[in-house]
Amino acid sequence: MSLHSLCVPTILLISVLSICLSSGGSSDSKLHRILIKRDAKEIESRPKAYISVQQSKAKEFLSGLHRTKRNVWDRSRPDVQQWIQQFMYMGYDEARLETDLSYWMDQARSNDQGRQHHHDENAPMSQQDPRYNRHGANVNYDYY
């Protein structure tokens, strides 16, 4: 009896809320539309100098921004300079060399067996799906 007495008010509440939320025909409420109109009027009424920055100041700020060059290796060492010269002799340009080196160094870091967990990290669902929890290759037994 108590379950029935709880279900009826709950169903009535859900139906009233769904009717109230679906009325109006649009996704935005009237209050939301009024607030948007008010904000648009405030923005239009502001003077332009209040919003924008002078062009000279903007160019001065943007001219200082530049991306620093990525160096995977310490180029001050003579052996590194020799390696880079050899790679460039083989046809690599420096940007391609940096890209390839960072890729392979990241690969080496991610495939380190000491950092592997006891589940297969390459599986579609990882450890969440028990079918892909394998105890074989790529398993670090230090965790047991």
UniProtKB/Swiss-Prot annotation:
Q: Where is the composition biased (Basic and acidic residues)?
A: 112-122
Keyword Membrane found: yes
Q: Where in the cell is it found?
A: Secreted; Cytoplasm; Apical cell membrane
Q: What is its main location?
A: secreted
Q: Which GO terms describe its biological process?
A: anaphase-promoting complex-dependent catabolic process; cellular senescence; central nervous system development; G1 to G0 transition; negative regulation of cell population proliferation; regulation of cell population proliferation; response to wounding
The record's keywords, sorted A to Z, are:
Cell membrane, Cleavage on pair of basic residues, Cytoplasm, Membrane, Secreted, Signal
Please give the GO cellular component terms listed in this UniProt entry: apical plasma membrane; cytoplasm; extracellular space
Region span, Disordered? 109-144
Q: Which InterPro entries does the annotation name?
A: Augurin
Prodomain positions: 19-68
- List the Pfam families: Augurin
Write the signal peptide boundaries.
Answer: 1-18
Q: What does this protein do?
A: Probable hormone. Required for the proper formation of the central nervous system by attenuating cell proliferation during development.
Member of which family?
A: Belongs to the augurin family.
Q: What protein does this entry describe?
A: Augurin-B
User: Which gene codes for it?
Assistant: ecrg4b
